[in-house]
Amino acid sequence: MHVVGIMGSPRRDSNTEILLDAALAGAAECGATTEKVAVCELHILPCTECYHCAVDGTCSIKDDMSHLYDVIVSADRIILASPVFFYGLTSQAKALVDRCQALWMRRRVLKSWMPDLEARKGALIAVGATSGPKLFDGVLLTAKYFFDAVGVRDFDHLLVRGLDGRAQVRDYPEHISRATELGRSLAAG
């Protein structure tokens, strides 16, 4: 069992990263191998909508995303983690999500990659500063279609409101415990 965590925060030691680390630790407790992808440290350009991926399922842009396709395809479990920026993912996380159009093409158009949808699972961790009732609506919708593109039918989520300061989540051990349990559940299920 291999669990890949995609850390979409633009800064390190963020609330998002702390929760993702807890989830990955929970998965590791259940015997899973884990890998964290810190998108903020990678060079991932936005999708240019050139449709090169419609030809053979590969992206024409050569950057750090080239390696991540293999990481995503080989994962048994995927955790997408992002703070909420204007009711959506960060631009760093969204660039990675948009570039997964190549995987969607492989799966849905070219039929060259057919993952076992029953075996692959996912999770979303989203952290927002406000308490608005629709705070996570955009993130959840984007996550739904990201997970579809990467061959994940079912995903769980941890949505945390009211955190804005760097590493503020450390003052709320219940959120960290929930993230650890999310990782355990993901690895066990």
Region spans (language model):
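N-terminal beta-loop-helix "entrance" segment that forms/cooperates
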Residues: 36-58, 164-175
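Residue-level recognition of beta-strand->loop/alpha-helix junctions
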Residues: 7, 38, 158-159
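N-terminal beta1-alpha1 ligand-phosphate binding loop
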Residues: 1-32
